[in-house]
Amino acid sequence: MNKEDASGSPRKGLLEPATALTGSLLTMLLFFLSYGYSIGDDLPFHLGSWQAAALLLRQGVYPQWEAAAAYGAGEPRFVFYPPLSWLLGALLRTLATPPHAAEWFICLAAAGCWLAMYWATRRWATVPAALLAASIYAAAPYMLFSSLQRAAFGELLAATWLPLLFAACISPAPSVAAIAMPLALLWLTNAPTAILGSYLLLFVALFQLLKMLLRQAPACVVALRAGVFAGGTALGLLLTSFFLLPALVQAKDVQLDTAFEHGQGFRDNFLIRHTALTSRQTLHEVTAMMAAYVFALLCVFVAIGVLRRRRPRPVAETYPGSLRLLLSVLACLVFFLMLPPSAFVWQHLPKLAVLQFPWRLLSLLTLVLAYAVALLVNEVRIRPSHAVLVSIAVSAMLMSAGAATYWRDPQQMEQHGLRPADVAARIQLRPTQEYTPAGANNTGLQQMDSPSCSVASVAPTETLSVHPLQLRFHLQGPATCTLPLRNYPRWTVLAQGRAAPLIPRRDGRIMLQLPAADAVVEVRWRRGWDNVVGVALSLATLLTLFLFAAHSRRHT
């Protein structure tokens, strides 16, 4: 591994990366101060999730149910949405108002992307090469598109782990723990990006094994390398069992397939294709972005070839073998998968359709571009101090272009239900289609602030507690009562301390028969076997990874 800068002297300090990262973040904060926060498509969803999670965590309850969604009827959002992004958002929400919490989230995610790419490329590249690669990766057009226009905060945070996974896979001596940890972090941050990362792992593993076979490596060595990739994948997935197992078991209890309706499937979002359900603006922006990426990659690879041909004598390569070929093949594959002829691949590869939008593959193309830039800058001699200034300037130029293209004007806050006067107290009312409980219908769903009964009450209904929900009814006679809460298999509903039979409703709300007396109804969340087994598997896997790391360190 190359641990020298362009001048050839060892550099052990952190001055250059710290200065470059600080300059890039200050530039981003300056744009936020100048423009205000951006109204991304999913901003209300995330602000509502963060606010609900922060409230529950302050009460000592691990979030499972988003009570404010679906006009107060609720949905099991936190069962299915990976926890790392909303846990970070909840922390930021307790420290700042909603708009500023979103700004800090974007800055922290950008810093994570910067640090991850710097670390991944610095293992073999010079300091200037790693600085430029990190700045381009963190402020690339697709990153700004995701953060400013889409407010896809989970996807943005998950981009932090992709360079770590890729670096572990292309390492000359990959380890199980180095593969397992970033893979697990991907699955705990964002499902579409985790699927991308899993296929990236599979692609690089096959590429590496094929290269070893072509070089006639011993069969035992090839088998050992395959075992490392397989073991890292298995342990990475098992490490997420506390989240992934309950989500898989409970998938039948919600309407996940509705996420792919109304133009949200891969067939409606290929490049160079427009359907009645496709957003023309998004298609135009993504196509332009793709053209810019392809042009930049071509220029970088041509420049690398020219520089290498002009060398007076062969120079030993410090980067992993066949990296340029791997990046070229990966870029071509990504480009193909964004075009309509690749529909058969999307249809038959397991879970690839969960990505919904083929242009999400631009996150991989961003990774390829950053690595290609590192390869290019690694071929030339640049002073680290000059590289710091160049990296900050590159970040500023990319952010300026991104702000002009993707920033959503805060003047449109009222249109999106985010007026400054009530943004701190706002709640997410609209239901999320894919998290709607099975059998429930969102059509005609209205706000219900309190329970309703078929007979009059002699006194107002009392709320005895919120977690668990306990209500006391004062009824004049036997009545059918409806709670402002949707039914879900994990709810245990008790009336007078006994399990209460429920009456089906079209909107899915809990409805039950109560006697003519003071009746206490309790609704409690029940932990299932999947939660217990999931936590046990995650803890056992964490212990296994610790033992792997200790064994590896002892032998080293």
Give the positions of each predicted feature.
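Membrane-interface segments at or immediately adjacent to transmembrane helices
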Residues: 408-470
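Alpha-helical scaffolds flanking conserved acidic
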Residues: 133, 326, 446-449, 512
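Intrinsically disordered, low-complexity regions
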Residues: 9, 14, 41, 322, ...
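Active-site-proximal, structured, solvent-exposed surfaces of multi-pass membrane proteins
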Residues: 449-555
